[in-house]
Amino acid sequence: WITMTDLMTGLVLVFVVMFLYSFLQNNVEKFQDDLAKENSSKALQETLKERNVEAIIDSATGIVKISDLELFEINKSDLSPKGKEYLDKFIPAYIDSLFENDYLKGRIDKILIQGHTDSQNFAGQFTEDEQYMKNMELSLNRAYSVANYMIKTPYNKNYGKKLRETVIVEGASSSTPVLVNGKEDFAKSRRVELKLIMKKNVK
């Protein structure tokens, strides 16, 4: 006969095994995700250096940060001539570093283009909620402008389908400011970020 003690011991062992499996699986996925992002960062840094293009890249996450002044006029969401000139150099380097990399190209699920603003108020009588939503609109429209330029410009025709499947946009308003010594750095907070979202369980 199986005693109640034996039954409970067996159940505990089953739960322990399930917990360990889940824990290890999550850690493997995180390791793969971190490795892919580190790989993308290294590949992009090398490509940008070769092509003499400047960008701020987080070596651990692969996130690219582009200052608003590189792309837009103040409080505008249409790309400036300077912005188009910059993207004409940056985007081919960015795309090539991702889609010509054998390790990365099958692991990328989405490319998130995310707009950010600072928390300074627009001129006029607006409530805090209205100010936040105006910044939301500006940040979203700026992300859209970059994505639109990335997809529509001629040099990406070889990757057109891939970009349409992966590029998504998001407006973060002033929700994630860049802090320096505990205070918001307005200039650094106004930016467009490009982030990679990796597929899960890719061998």
Give residue spans per PLM region.
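Periplasmic peptidoglycan-binding/anchoring modules of Gram-negative envelope and division proteins
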Residues: 72, 76-113, 147-152, 158, ...
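Extracytoplasmic
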Residues: 50-52, 59-61, 67, 74, ...
